[in-house]
Amino acid sequence: MVVMPPQNSVNESEGRYLQDGFWQHGRFYGSWKPGKYLFPIDSEELNRLDIFHKVFLLARDNKPFLAPIRRPSPRIMDIGTGTGIWAINVAEECLSDAQIMAVDLNQIQPALIPPGFMPKQYDIEEPSWGPLLTDCDLIHMRMLLGSIQTDLWPQVYHNVFEHLTPGIGFFEHIEVDWIPRCDDDERPANSAFVKWAELFLDGMDRFNRSVRVTPQEHRQMLEAAGFTDIRQEVIKAYVCPWSADRNEREIARWFNIGLSHSLEAMSLKPLIEKLGFEAEEVRELCERAKRETCVLRYHTYCNIHVWTARKPGPQQ
């Protein structure tokens, strides 16, 4: 059943614009270009996206970006902005004079936005990014694996490169590798979380929207697009706060909350529509995985990958 909210209607409890959408598998999905974004856009999902903003801030010493900004009134794009929280954070706390275009397939940004914040509904799988901001000092992207057709990543990186300023334009890309890892074998032999991850990755592969993090391939695609000064950082995010390290515990607390909101939201469509699961089977697996990720004696973690790169100048 398609739900059509009134034009420019506002969800007062969340303070966000609603967009046309439909209910499926018990969740609300966006109806603009359906099938491209496989995850919900309901309140629970928007909260999940905001929680991961906190995770990434903690993982990066509370810095929303690390690229040097060398011009006054910089031009910035946030690709796949989601709720817009990163772009709003930058506009309000870091670069109040910046012009920031926040691009997403779905219109789920807040009703009240800071000066310089420009929400833009656009499909970044389009071959040309003609309507988007050019001459950018910084382009930021995170958690877009699964939202981009697997074979279109070289095209996306090329368009990022084309929209940066030569010499001083930087790109930052952050992804979570959802494959659970453990360095000391402290996790259950028949891990529900491992099973969930295997099925989720398989289902997304069958949609041709892979969520697999392949560091060497990403580096090669960035090099092929023309980037230089390519760096990659890998940060552990434990799924529960067992570590003696205070920072690791704090990242883990927030990652655990985000993960508990993520399991069902991310896996309903791939497991039901590509692997033949019933909705209740998916939810039962997710509940078992949630319980497992809250057991302190299990030392499972996921890796957060951060790529930074620069567009060289004409003489470089």
Swiss-Prot record:
Q: What's its job? A: Methyltransferase that performs automethylation. No other methyl-accepting substrate has been identified yet. Component of the velvet transcription factor complex that acts as a global regulator for secondary metabolite gene expression. Controls the biosynthetic gene cluster for beauvericin, a depsipeptide mycotoxin that functions as a virulence determinant. The velvet complex also regulates chromatin structure and transcription of siderophore biosynthetic genes and is required for infection of tomato plants. The velvet complex also governs expression of nitrate metabolism genes.
Give the protein's recorded name: Secondary metabolism regulator laeA
Q: Provide one Gene Ontology cellular component.
A: nucleus
What are the UniProt keywords, alphabetically?
Methyltransferase, Nucleus, S-adenosyl-L-methionine, Sporulation, Transcription, Transcription regulation, Transferase, Virulence
Against Pfam families, the record matches this protein to: Methyltransf_23 (PF13489)
How does inactivating the gene affect the organism?
Impairs production of beauvericin and attenuates virulence during infection of tomato plants. Impairs also growth on the non-preferred nitrogen sources nitrate and nitrite.
Q: Which InterPro entries match?
A: SAM-dependent_MTases_sf
Q: Which reaction does it catalyse?
A: L-methionyl-[protein] + S-adenosyl-L-methionine = S-methyl-L-methionyl-[protein] + S-adenosyl-L-homocysteine
Give the UniProt record's GO annotations in the biological process aspect.
Answer: methylation; sporulation resulting in formation of a cellular spore
Which family is annotated? Belongs to the methyltransferase superfamily. LaeA methyltransferase family.
Main location class:
nucleus
Q: Which GO terms describe its molecular function?
A: methyltransferase activity
Compartment(s) of residence: Nucleus
Query: What Enzyme Commission number(s) does the record list for this chain?
Result: 2.1.1.-
Q: What is said about its interaction partners and assembly?
A: Component of the heterotrimeric velvet complex composed of laeA, veA and velB; VeA acting as a bridging protein between laeA and velB.
Q: Which SUPFAM superfamilies match?
A: S-adenosyl-L-methionine-dependent methyltransferases
